[in-house]
From Swiss-Prot:
Gene Ontology MF, one: 4-hydroxyproline epimerase activity
Active-site residues, as the UniProt record annotates them: C90 (proton acceptor), C253 (proton donor)
Regulation: Inhibited by iodoacetate, iodoacetamide and by high amounts (10 mM) of pyrrole-2-carboxylic acid (PYC). Not inhibited by PYC at 1 mM.
EC number: 5.1.1.8
Protein name in UniProt: 4-hydroxyproline epimerase
Residues reported to bind substrate: G91, H92, D249, G254, T255
UniProt keywords, alphabetically: Isomerase
Subunit and interaction comment: Homodimer.
Domain of life: Bacteria
Organism: Brucella abortus biovar 1 (strain 9-941)
Amino acid sequence: MARHSFFCVDGHTCGNPVRLVAGGGPNLNGSTMMEKRAHFLAEYDWIRTGLMFEPRGHDMMSGSILYPPTRPDCDVAVLFIETSGCLPMCGHGTIGTVTMAIEQGLVTPKTPGKLNLDTPAGLVAIEYEQDGQYVERVRLTNVPAFLYAEGLEVECPDLGPIKVDVAYGGNFYAIVEPQENYTDMDDYSALQLIAWSPVLRQRLNEKYKFQHPELPDINRLSHILWTGKPKHPQAHARNAVFYGDKAIDRSPCGTGTSARMAQLAAKGKLKPCDEFIHESIIGSLFHGRVERAAEVAGRPAIVPSIAGWARMTGYNTIFIDDRDPFAHGFSMA
């Protein structure tokens, strides 16, 4: 029996939690971060569930673990952990991780104000603005994003048949826009969206195949993005992003914003250099931008960037005690 200790720096990005594991993370095998992610999932997923789920975490908890980079063009590598698993990429997690890692001196950039992250989804370039000891803003240039499928039909509880577009922005997103059986996210409660989303996700994954053309380990739809009209005067659109089993992202969701921009660009509604300001369910904003056009295995794509802010909330030394019947966490149905 052992008691495992993890030193964490806690914070949030635009309202959504980030738990940066600064000490206690396991050594991982693999020549790439995708391979290290696979090793973590095979042998150490109890760390994720123990730190993310109750009683040490909660349904919305999201986090990261820092590693030495596996590629020479990067400053640091990041493994993303949350209640839904080990995501290949996490936008709000990146902004929070970079903010806290810089402020706490956990990483020293080769060039001040810039940082290259080695993630399972690929290289993510960072620019950050620092005022004294505090990081005030982080802009990440994400992996290429693309529209994967249009008009996929699925039966939604209570609403009936709806159509969704699926886009990739670091994860696969089903995007639900206004249509005959769905009006606007504001017309439904968060509890309704949380109840419908896992059913939609399961039915879509059973009915359709979602496979990244270059990354074989990215092979399922993981998120549902419900759209709505913005309330903030600066915003172009509003969203409620569902992930995990019962979570609505409190931030505007970085990879979700990337997927949304890719969808809009594919339909001619955004072009390179266009700005896209995305509003979350609680009113916080991400400032997106289409950096340039791209291709992914012959598919039209974009390279999106996302800017946002994060704040550290404290230090947390967490024990996972093998004697504890809830050592590996639990989630209430």
